[in-house]
Amino acid sequence: MDNNDRFRRPSDGRLPHNRKELFFNILRWRFTYLLAIGLLSLAFLLPDIAALTYNDIAASVISQSGEDVASKIVTLRLQTSLLQIICYIVLFFGASGVFYLLRQLAWDEPTSIFSGWWQGVKQNWIHYTFLGVCVGILNVLNTFAEVLLHGFVKYVPRALFVLVVVPVLLYAAILDVVYIKKLGNLLSGAATLYFKTLPITLLFTLLVIAPTLLLFVPKFTIRYAILATWVVVVLPIVLYGWTLYAIDKLDKFINKEHYPEIYNKGVYVDKASSKEDTEE
């Protein structure tokens, strides 16, 4: 099989044989589409970047004042975390459309960016926005813990957030654009899938939150320039890879038995393989 046959143009009407092939097809033929998704994601991340920039500038001014610096910095951190609740609502509202676009790519049925995004928002914004509120509140509680507690213990809530909450949210984001379910069922299903696929899911979680390490870069102009580049170029690839992986697990644990109409959707399965799957 030559390279041009392996990586087929999306317009040639032939489905890829597996999701790995689909992943590289999209990277090759629709990379600009992924960049557009990245720009869309950046647009909804801008309020959070603005809040963090405000925090950086205010902290710099407070540090130079030399008066009651510690208590003022604590107050600033708490104010910023409260402001970020609104930022997370905006971010998750935008994500409701972004994950719909990624689902369409995973099913090899890409739509136009803006109409597809809006379709996803109309279908999923309520659950996503509620999750944004919850994440914002948890962020405030984590900040309180880091301010009030001492030693290693103060980092435990943030660590639990990364190790438990973020992976469950990643699965919930996919479940919500694939199925119509109540939020409680989505979260319980997401938690079950996470613990069934823990190592790989944790790896994707770390890739998604990797940009937070940029907060340790001293110069905030460089920090946010790198962050913007990451969100536009790298994050869409990571999220698309995650979407393909998650949908593959949905096929394995759910779709094969309960939703055969979307089982292996977006990839070519020959009749022999399909027959073997049925007999298993």
Where are these regions (language model features)?
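Helix-coil boundary and N-terminal low-complexity module in membrane systems
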Residues: M1-T143, V147, G151-Y155, V168-L170, ...
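Small-residue-enriched core segments of transmembrane alpha-helices in multipass membrane transport
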Residues: A159-L163
